[in-house]
Amino acid sequence: MTRTTVPLVVALALAFAGPAAAADPHPPLKPVPELDLQRYAGTWHEIARLPMDEQAECARDVTATYTLDPGGTIAVRNECTRTDGSRLVAEGMARRGDAPAKLEVRFAPRWLSALPFVWADYWVIALDDDYRWAIVGEPGRDYLWILSRERVVDARTLDGLKARARMLGYDLRELIVNP
C-alpha cells in the first residue's frame, strides 16, 4: 500500500465504525444474576411501561400473574381495564432461558410453541431484594415494564425505578405511568 492509501483506509474504517459505535453507547443489557421463581410467582401490578401494540388498549389496572406449573413452565395471565371499562385478558406461558432471570414468554397457541418466533424475551433486569418491585425488559431495550407487588408506589420509589431504568440505557420519554 502507498502512504496515502493507508490513511485513506483508516479514515474510511473510522467513518463507518464511528456511527455504529455511537448508535448504542450503553453496554449490553444483563439480567439480574439470580431469580427465585417461587418468590417471583404471584401477581404483579404494572406501574409503568414503554408503549407496545399488545397493550395499546390498556388504560389502567394492569396486572401480570405468574403461576408455576409442575413441568417447570410458568403460566402467565395478563389483565387490564380498557378505557370503556371492559377487561382485556391475555394468557400465555413462560419458560427459563439460558440464565436464571432470562425468561421467554409466548401468547401464541401451545401448538405453535415449537416455532422460535412466537417466543419473546422477558428479562428481569432489576429486582428488589424482597421481591417488592421488578424492572423487566429485553436486550433491544424496546420494551420495559416497572412492576410492583402493590397497586401503587410512592413518587420517590417510582423516581428511583425510573432512574435505574435510565442507568440501564432506557429512553423513558414515552414512558406510560399507570393512573
Language-model features: locations:
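A beta-rich soluble binding module of mature secreted/lumenal proteins
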Residues: 19-179
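Bacterial N-terminal signal peptides
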Residues: 7-17
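Positively charged n-region of N-terminal signal peptides that target proteins for export
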Residues: 1-5
